[in-house]
């Protein structure tokens, strides 16, 4: 438990009263994975991919700088509140957008990530878009797909919000959002002292081989911050497939089920309970499951809410 408490203590101690942020002085250069990207002005025709990235844009009040979004309804049930906030902005593609989708929208900026709107070796990449006058900022967690990275932490999310704040000259909003997330995390931490971490497995999808989160994916940070121990923390990968044998050997006490896609969370739970190979697993025997939506377990503004839910489930602490 000591590493968890040490990390959370440091996070809590870094919370400081907000000061007025300086306006962005263009041109501004930011780091995006292994690239430096320079912006001469705030983008005016931005596109975000996936629900978690789009919610970051909306939380920063950037709808007036956007021409659309993509990758939401093809994977998730539409969130009425988010759709309301997006107003008349169109969904350019229900899943990953094509180069043509972005060109037809006359986009000048693409906020996406590797496996969050871009694929290694695909047509839509920062390099291919740059030749067309479209600048790209890559989700920090996703950089693990193209370069060596350390264990995922909430600093990855804070980094994305603060960099977006610099790119769009909304640094006050970004800093306020990060401070609120840190303060909520601090309140969770106060309730975790002396509590032993349960063994936790995140089940995303898959029957033959389950998709889960290794230590380079953000659920590693969420589980740890909630006072749990990710049984796949020794897997040096982000979102990845493992075999059921490794799940049985690790014997998780809690299983987190990601609710999205065509297979419901209830169907995923039923599959786990009917899988003969898992009958000895503590979480299955004790029916100890936590269901979280996709948007909560991918990097974004819902991560602290996920931590609050997990902490309540792991340790019966107040939310």
What is the predicted role of each segment?
Residues 212-239:
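Alpha-helical, coiled-coil/dimerization segments enriched in small aliphatic residues
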Residues 32-34, 89-100, 120, 235-244:
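Short helix-initiation/N-cap motifs at beta->coil->alpha
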Residues 22-24:
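Boundary of Sec targeting at the N-terminus
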Residues 48-105, 109-118, 231:
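A short, structured surface patch at a secondary-structure boundary
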Residues 26-29, 36, 124-206, 287-319:
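Extracytoplasmic substrate-binding proteins
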Residues 16-18:
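N-terminal signal peptide c-region/cleavage motif recognized by signal peptidases
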Residues 52-55, 72-75, 109-110, 115-119, ...:
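Solvent-exposed loop/turn segments at secondary-structure junctions
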Residues 1-8:
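Bacterial N-terminal signal peptides that target proteins for export
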């Amino acid at each position: 438990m000591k590493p968890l408490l040490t990390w959370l203590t440091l996070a809590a101690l870094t919370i400081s009263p907000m000061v007025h942020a300086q306006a962005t002085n263009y041109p501004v250069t930011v780091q995006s994975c292994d690239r430096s990207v320079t912006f001469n002005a705030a983008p005016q025709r931005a596109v975000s991919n996936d629900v978690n990235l789009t919610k970051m844009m909306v939380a920063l009040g950037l709808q007036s700088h956007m021409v659309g979004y993509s990758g939401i309804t093809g994977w998730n049930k539409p969130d009425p509140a988010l759709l309301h906030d997006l107003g008349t902005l169109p969904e350019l593609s229900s899943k990953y957008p094509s180069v043509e989708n972005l060109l037809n929208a006359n986009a000048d900026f693409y906020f996406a990530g590797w496996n969050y709107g871009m694929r290694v070796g695909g047509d839509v990449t920062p390099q291919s878009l740059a030749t067309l006058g479209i600048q790209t900022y890559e989700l920090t967690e996703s950089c693990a797909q193209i370069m060596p990275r350390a264990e995922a932490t909430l600093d990855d999310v804070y980094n994305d919000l603060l960099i977006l704040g610099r790119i769009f000259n909304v640094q006050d909003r970004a800093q306020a959002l990060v401070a609120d997330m840190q303060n909520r995390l601090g309140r969770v931490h106060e309730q975790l002292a002396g509590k032993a971490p349960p063994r936790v497995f995140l089940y995303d999808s898959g029957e033959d081989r389950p998709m889960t989160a290794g230590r380079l994916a953000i659920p590693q940070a969420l589980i740890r911050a909630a006072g749990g121990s990710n049984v796949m923390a020794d897997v040096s990968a982000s979102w990845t497939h493992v075999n059921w044998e490794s799940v049985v050997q690790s014997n998780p006490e809690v299983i987190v089920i990601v609710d999205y896609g065509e297979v419901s969370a209830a169907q995923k739970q039923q599959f786990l309970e009917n899988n003969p190979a898992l009958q000895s697993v503590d979480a299955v025997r004790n029916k100890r499951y936590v269901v979280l939506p996709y948007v909560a377990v991918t990097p974004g503004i819902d991560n602290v809410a996920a931590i609050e839910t997990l902490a309540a489930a792991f340790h019966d602490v107040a939310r």
